[in-house]
Amino acid sequence: MKTIAVNSFKGGTAKTSTTLHLGAALAQYHKARVLLIDFDAQANLTAGLGLDPDCYDSLAVVLQGEKNIEEVIRPIDSSGLDLIPADTWLERVEVSGSLAADRYSHERLKIILSKIEHRYDYVIIDTPPSLCWLTESALIAAQHALICATPEFYSVKGLERLATFIQGISSRHPLNILGVTLSFWNYRGKNNAAFTELIQKTFPGKLLNTRIRRDITISEAAIHGKPVFSTAPSARASEDYLKLTEELLFLLRNI
């Protein structure tokens, strides 16, 4: 089982859309068994797959020892895609209950996921856009980190702090940076070269070749609670996310 934490230090980087479509592509087009984990209290991944966050338990109850992980997994479709939803309790889970007194609380998610490693080929975790307890726990539990950015100044500058954060974790836990993916891409953007150069300096050799172009069909798919492969299979967003999935699979197979 390969576990991937999808990260950014700033909102609006298509982190959740990337998580959703990577998982959906692996399940639908590569026949993989995929578990998506919404580890962000905003619960956008949950809503983007058509579930109401107020109606389901999140990993919070599992982290607190109140339920087993199998009890919070929700099937999304018959392709092999499952989801653990998010809820607002995630935002404060580390300061309540049994986690509050556990000095090794960051390790719990890794231990929990080890119990289902026979069940899935991939676990993909959508982390909050901040350097918080949830993000650290996800990175400790993961073997790989996928970093999301946009060709904007604040997004690219935020990568420097994220790089320092990840470096601190990888010094204690094995963690491979799978790559940096750029979304909302415009091939005619006048500052493209400057942004890509800064990313290469921050994460040398990790900028992925695939660019996710801006496409309204992604937002339209979210309204319907489905991936864009289902609502607009011929859209450029579908093409881009399938290419991204192929590129990531190549990297995973050649590590």
Swiss-Prot record:
Organism this protein belongs to: Chlamydia trachomatis serovar D (strain ATCC VR-885 / DSM 19411 / UW-3/Cx)
Family: Belongs to the ParA family.
CDD domains on file: ParAB_family (cd02042)
UniProt protein name: ParA family protein CT_582
